A protein has these predicted regions:
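A short SAM/SAH-binding and catalytic strip from SAM-dependent methyltransferases
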Residues: 1-18
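SAM/dcSAM-binding transferase cores
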Residues: 61-138
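A short glycine-rich, Lys/Arg-flanked "PGG" loop and its adjoining helix->strand segment in the class I
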Residues: 17-36
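Conserved class I S-adenosyl-L-methionine
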Residues: 8-13, 41-57
Length: 138
């Protein structure tokens, strides 16, 4: 994944990121166990967030750097965007993430599911409290 749109975290636009957990979990469907994703970006926020996204989506971060060109690996192929950002003095961040074959390694839960679970727990607690108060009035 090279220099994808960082989709700032304003509103819900970050959900469109190619490294957002929903996307990374989808990639697990066709990526072989132990398969790798190489990710490069110039965007600091996207990279920092992705450092959390990958493990929550069932990937082990095997290698990472906040300055790819400081000790550039032999495998790196510089893209046009990479060259442009480097000339501007922007450091290129990169990582290699490996798919963990264990489905239990996916710990991410969709935010709307978390909200629903919290709402249901609050409703159950309120119902239990009301039932308890009703028993005390008898």
């Amino acid at each position: 994944i090279n220099f994808c749109n960082p989709w700032s975290k304003n509103g819900s636009s970050h959900k469109h990121r190619l490294t957002y957990p929903r996307q990374l979990i989808n990639y697990r469907e066709f990526l072989k166990d132990g398969g790798e994703i190489y990710f490069k970006t110039d965007d600091d926020d996207l990279f920092r967030d992705s450092l959390e996204y990958f493990p929550a989506s069932g990937y082990d971060i095997e290698w990472m750097t906040f300055d790819l060109h400081e000790n550039e690996p032999e495998w790196n192929i510089r893209t046009e965007h990479e060259g442009m950002f480097t000339e501007m003095g922007i450091k290129i961040k990169a990582l290699i993430a490996r798919k963990d074959p264990d489905p239990a390694s996916v710990t991410w839960i969709e935010p709307k599911i978390l909200k629903r679970q919290a709402r249901e727990a609050a409703e159950a607690e309120a119902a239990a409290k009301a039932a308890q108060e009703g028993e005390g009035n008898e």
